[in-house]
Amino acid sequence: QMCIRDRVTGASYGIGFAIASGMAKAGATIVFNDIKQELVDKGLAAYEEAGIKAHGYVCDVTNEDAVNELVAKIEAEVGVIDILVNNAGIIKRIPMCEMTAAQFRQVIDVDLNAPFIVAKAVIPSMIKKGHGKIINICSMMSELGRETVSAYAAAKGGLKMLTRNICSEYGEYNIQCNGIGPGYIATPQTAPLREIQPDGSRHPFDQFIIAKTPAARWGEAEDLAGPAVFLASDASNFVNGHVLYVDGGILAYIGKQPQ
């Protein structure tokens, strides 16, 4: 059983769009936001093409006042938010010692502070209603380190712990807060890394990912829809404070022995 209103941050395309589309098929009313009007318009057109009615809003989720105003507007125009998916995120691939503190803070602001701000805005109404679902989009980098992504890994590790803490503080109000940790997902942003090279070979990073993934492929955005629907439904009412890794098995796999 799916609740009525589902708000997804950053759901105009990619992973957020796939998750929201899956929830719409399960019966949710979709409310999404993005930082620019052009992205909201693009998202609305994509939902319409898919036969999904969606409500789109412009909002900078790092701005607490703007988020509070938007949540009040959504509650007035659509209704109380039953399900929140915190999907907005950025990454800066810069070696740590070359990254400025301002660049580090920018990643933390979007990937960690924003989920805190948005969750804080919707939880009071969930408490009043007596139930709620919060899904934070974490990452394999909530568990692993990798060169050039120190800010992203720090933020996603923090988001994992924020997920657990929301569970700890608000579980008694029938609010379930869980996370989804995607593996390497085939999106427009990763397309250049998956293109066949002029000599017919695979891109080195593509080879690396396929070798490291027991499923031997990149994930698809649609692979995340089912787990999100589960975590948003009554089927997960006793699941709280967990991160479900949808990674094709990377975190379980040490890799093959060199020949």
Regions found by a protein language model. Give the residues of each.
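Alpha-helical segment proximal to the catalytic Tyr-Lys
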Residues: 124, 168-172, 237
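Short, small/polar-rich loop/turn modules that mediate ligand/substrate recognition or access, typified
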Residues: 85, 171, 176, 239-241
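Residue(s) in the substrate-gating loop at a strand-loop-helix junction
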Residues: 139
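Substrate-binding pocket helix/loop in short-chain dehydrogenase/reductase
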Residues: 95-96, 103-108, 209
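Active-site helix of classical SDR
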Residues: 119, 155, 163
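Short, small-residue-biased leader/transition segments that mark boundaries at the very start
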Residues: 2-4
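Conserved glycine-rich cofactor-binding loop
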Residues: 10-14
